[in-house]
A protein has these predicted regions:
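Surface-exposed cleft-lining segments at the edges of enzyme active sites
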Residues: 29-33, 75-78, 110-119
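C-terminal soluble interaction/assembly domains
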Residues: 112, 119, 134, 141-143, ...
Length: 243
């Protein structure tokens, strides 16, 4: 058997903000620079430090992960995207020390050819997860991030009009439902309103210089995403509705 480091729990001064980035490959950093630490959570961490905030940013993104599916996941029947958000919530969020804020970017894989969920099912999944977080970690601020476009992606599982329609419905929910204490509009940052696709400058893959897949942003895309996050929203007092 193999042993892997799962996490490092560190002593920190009282009041240190702990921000969890929860999501799929676009949080994990697919298409960023290999060993470059230029994913959007890395960008956020550096911005916080530069602004004088001693904060911890924890990346719990998993490539291929979904909010609701697949329902049949089990250790005996594993799935490349791992257990869904609800199933891994205890391990990857609730059990962490000192969490003050969570940024949740997820849903595109639920609508891919690897997922069968409707927009309404993902919305309900988000409601359930947010409810569990509030019950276990009262006072934690939960930020919803709009899902970036995958329209016309060359990725085998993504790119369809149906996927994009569901994504838009989910984003409308994230922006307007009031479920979240704040909203980060990554969709607006990464998407080209003229084409509905990812902005062309965010497409070429950062490590190999390849064509990219119109699903995963490159280093420039992650930089723009990380720079778009309102630090005051993350660190200020908890709001009762999205903004």
């Amino acid at each position: 058997s193999w042993y892997f480091l799962d996490a490092i729990d560190m002593m920190a001064p009282a009041g240190t903000p702990v921000i969890v980035a929860f999501g799929d490959s676009i949080t994990d950093g697919t298409a960023s620079t290999l060993n470059g630490d230029d994913r959007w959570p890395n960008v956020l961490s550096r911005r916080l430090a530069a602004a004088g905030h001693r904060a911890a940013v924890i990346n719990t993104g998993i490539g291929g992960n979904q909010v609701t599916g697949p329902a049949e996941y089990s250790p005996q029947k594993p799935f490349a995207g791992g257990p869904n958000a609800a199933m891994r919530l205890e391990r990857d969020v609730l059990s962490l020390s000192g969490v003050t804020t969570l940024i949740w970017l997820e849903g595109i894989n639920d609508f891919s050819r690897n997922g069968t969920a409707s927009a309404e099912q993902v919305q309900q999944g988000m409601k359930d997860v947010v409810g569990r977080i509030h019950a276990k970690l009262p006072g934690v601020k939960i930020i919803g991030a709009t899902v970036t476009t995958a329209l016309n992606s060359t990725n085998a599982a993504s790119g369809s009009l149906d996927q994009d329609a569901k994504r838009k419905a989910l984003n409308a929910f994230i922006r307007t439902s009031g479920l979240f204490d704040g909203v980060v509009d990554f969709d607006k940052v990464a998407g080209d309103p003229a084409t509905g696709e990812m902005k062309v400058e965010f497409v070429p893959e950062s490590t190999t210089g390849g064509a990219g897949d119109k699903l995963h942003p490159n280093r420039a895309g992650y930089l723009a995403m990380g720079n778009s996050i309102d630090l005051d929203m993350l660190l200020g007092k908890k709001k009762s509705a999205s903004r």
